[in-house]
Regions:
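Repeated scaffold domains used in trafficking and secretory/extracellular systems
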Residues: 50-53, 91-96, 143-151, 200-206, ...
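Blade-level signature of beta-propeller repeat domains, shared across WD40, Kelch, NHL, RCC1
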Residues: 347-372
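Asp-box/BNR beta-propeller loop motif
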Residues: 30-43, 69-85, 121-138, 181-194, ...
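Loop/turn-rich, solvent-exposed surfaces of beta-rich toroidal or solenoidal domains
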Residues: 299-323
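Entry beta-strands of beta-propeller and related beta-repeat scaffolds
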Residues: 61-63, 101-105, 160-169, 211-215, ...
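Recurrent small/Gly-Pro-centered beta-turn motifs in extracellular repeat architectures
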Residues: 66, 106-109, 170-173, 216-219, ...
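Short glycine/acidic-enriched loop and turn motifs that connect beta-strands
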Residues: 110-114, 174-177, 220-223, 271-274, ...
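Beta-strand-rich domains and repeat architectures in extracellular enzymes and scaffolds
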Residues: 43-68
Length: 372
């Protein structure tokens, strides 16, 4: 790797590290409290920095992961959490489960963040997260690191019972290289797809079924040259089509949310040091990812976007540097809401009477909404 490229990657790493450190130093103690908009901060173990992913299989059973190599589990909707894995040197960036027993956790890999020594890209559990082991046959040659895990379940009849066949995708990573893992047999075997002809960074992966999917990406490993990029596939990841590319440097798309098959939103991250570059935008599609338009989130140089989640086509949230943002009109207008700092992932699950939401960043927040 050229010396200049290494220096630029180190610079980006330092910027991200200093940013999340600043968040953590101003973060209050982690005790349960209520936000004015209904988001409630849950009691969790203190962590200095941005935590990256949370996943729930039911409104009550879920897990979250962070960069210190820890995986936590709750069975009571976040009222209490149990530490299930503590693996220093591992940076868990993503987590996903097929059901309450079988799941996967992705590691960012080495040569990006400091103090990360684990080269194992992907871990798995078959007992609800009580124990974890490296996924057999998946090496760093297949994928250097993982930023997102997506699981698509298709129902089928198995010996007279309704069962599910899972197709699993794991993509990465920030800073390059760009690879996509795919399993079509519940994680028993894996194939690696080299994405370097299409993009240089993969930040999020969304699939609607086994064939049709969307990737949030960056055009260049050098962030000062990178444009935000969105790709789609209709053949299970064999080929990809560019659907959106920003015309600004220092950008990449970060996280996605599709409340319906047609309507979707993706955060556009901006690292431009020019203080005149103040617009922060979200990409929106209304035709399933074929075309995209930019909608203004906020005009503020100090804001960086992270996670995003929409419960329907109109109402959703974006995690920002110091607070979150909420819209109830499909992104036409946004208002600040207290849901934690640097929220990197928002998970929303529908319930009988409404929905429940979880948002992880510096802290972990929960929203319970009942239909009127």
């Amino acid at each position: 790797m050229p010396f200049k490229k290494i220096n630029l990657l180190i610079l980006l790493t330092i910027i991200i590290s200093l940013t999340v450190l600043a968040f953590s130093q101003t973060s209050p103690p982690r005790t349960a409290s209520s936000g004015v908009n209904g988001w409630k901060k849950l009691t969790t173990e203190p962590f200095r920095g941005k935590q990256d992913d949370v996943f729930f299989v039911t409104p009550d059973v879920g897990w979250y992961v962070n960069g210190s190599g820890k995986i936590y589990k709750t069975i009571d909707g976040g009222s209490s959490w149990a530490l299930k894995l503590n693996k220093p040197g591992t940076y868990f960036r993503a987590i996903g489960f097929i059901d309450q027993q079988r799941g996967f956790a992705g590691n960012i890999g080495t040569n990006y963040f400091p103090n990360v020594t684990d080269t194992t890209p992907l871990y798995e559990t078959s007992d609800g997260g009580e124990t974890w082991k490296p996924v057999a046959g998946v090496t760093e040659q297949m994928i250097k690191g993982i930023c997102a895990i997506e699981i698509v379940k298709k129902p089928f009849i198995n010996a007279g019972k309704l069962d599910y066949k899972a197709t699993i995708y794991a993509g990465g990573r920030v800073g390059s290289p760009a690879f996509l893992l795919k399993s079509e047999d519940n994680g028993a075997s894996w194939q690696s797809i080299d994405m370097s002809r299409y993009c240089q960074m993969i930040l999020d992966v969304k699939f609607f079924d086994e064939k049709n999917g969307v990737i949030s990406a960056g055009t260049d490993a050098d962030v000062q040259k990178s444009n935000a990029l969105i790709l789609t596939t209709g053949d299970g990841g064999k080929t990809w089509t560019k659907r959106y590319q920003s015309n600004r440097p220092y950008e990449l798309t970060w996280k996605s949310s599709f409340p319906t098959r047609k309507v979707g939103y993706i955060t556009v991250q901006n690292y431009n040091p020019d203080k005149n570059a103040t617009e922060r935008v979200v990409a929106k599609t209304m035709d399933g990812g074929k075309t995209w338009k930019e909608i203004l989130l906020v005009n503020d140089f100090n804001v960086r976007e992270f996670g995003i989640g929409f419960i329907d086509e109109k109402r959703g949230w974006v995690g920002g540097t110091m607070s979150g943002y909420e819209t109830t009109d499909g992104g036409k207008t946004w208002k600040p809401v207290e849901m934690g700092k640097a929220v990197n992932k928002i998970r929303l699950l529908k319930t009988e009477n409404g929905f429940v939401g979880y948002a992880v960043g510096i802290d972990l927040y929960k929203l319970e909404y009942l239909n009127k």
